[in-house]
């Protein structure tokens, strides 16, 4: 103590040479038999598991764990996402593991939302769509039963002050080629009012100060609008099947 002031709520610690025993527990890991494939390993448990442990193989020096997917037999939607800051369609085309590992998820629908980063590189519409088309074809080649939906870029400005005509051209090409290339389209640029609505969207609190990225409310609004459009299309699909 440096003074005789002891205030309410404080803890006084007195050093002592005494010791206190602590109980320890030993965990035993039971290896599971994996079903290997070229780019993944699967394990199906007959009973529900509440925990698993990942233990490195001591016999292998170099290895990579690219992902872990936990599933059950309950009905519902299984949603996966991949988002890399600054990513463009050309980036996904560079790394073959993206297409090689995607079948592990057995996707029914793959949604692609790219374009804003390409616009800051000032990619021409033709260059952008060539890269996008390569990405789509790579996905379909490895996942022939999966549907592909391309989402256009939301409204944005270039370098805080210029009209982003690049994403407008990208949206045109995405819509014009949808039927020929056999993919679905959701025009977020149009649904969000186009580039002329940037001031209005910003006033609503949907956009960040750079007028490129969106706020939490803005991204949630995009998700809400997409979900409504998706369900509406699904209900229309069901009605035509009856």
What are the roles of these predicted feature ranges?
Residues 1-130, 213:
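Conserved SGNH/GDSL esterase-like catalytic core that processes O-acyl groups on lipids
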Residues 15, 83, 152, 189-192:
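Residues at the C-termini of beta-strands that transition into short coil/loop
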Residues 38-40, 96, 134, 169-171, ...:
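Residue-level detector of functional hotspots within protein domains
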Residues 97, 131-135, 225:
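Well-ordered alpha-helical segments embedded in enzymatic catalytic cores
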Residues 100-101, 138, 229:
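A generic secondary-structure signal
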Residues 106-119, 126-142, 147-190, 219:
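Conserved N-terminal glycine/acidic-rich loop preference
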Residues 155-242:
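Catalytic His-Asp segment of secreted/periplasmic serine-dependent ester chemistry enzymes
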């Amino acid at each position: 103590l440096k003074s005789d002031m002891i205030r309410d709520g404080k803890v006084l610690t007195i050093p002592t040479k005494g010791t206190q025993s602590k109980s320890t527990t030993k965990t035993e890991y039971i290896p599971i038999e994996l079903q290997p494939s070229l780019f993944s390993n699967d394990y199906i448990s007959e009973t529900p598991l509440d925990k698993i442990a990942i233990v490195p193989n001591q016999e292998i020096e170099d290895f990579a764990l690219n992902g872990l997917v936990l599933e059950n037999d309950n009905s519902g939607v299984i949603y996966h996402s991949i988002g890399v800051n600054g990513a463009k369609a050309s980036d996904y085309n560079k790394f073959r593991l993206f297409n090689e590992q995607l079948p592990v998820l057995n996707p029914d629908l793959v949604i692609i939302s790219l374009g804003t980063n390409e616009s800051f590189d000032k990619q021409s519409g033709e260059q952008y769509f060539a890269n996008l088309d390569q990405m789509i074809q790579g996905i379909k080649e490895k996942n022939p039963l999966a549907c592909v939906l391309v989402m256009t870029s939301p409204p944005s400005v270039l370098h805080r002050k210029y009209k982003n005509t690049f994403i407008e051209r990208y949206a045109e090409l995405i819509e014009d080629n949808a039927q020929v290339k056999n993919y679905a389209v959701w025009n977020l640029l149009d649904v969000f009012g186009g580039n002329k609505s940037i001031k209005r969207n910003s006033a609503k609190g949907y956009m960040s100060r750079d007028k490129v990225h969106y706020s939490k409310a803005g991204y949630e609004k995009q998700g809400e609008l997409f979900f409504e459009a998706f369900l509406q299309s699904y209900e229309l699909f069901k009605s035509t099947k009856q």
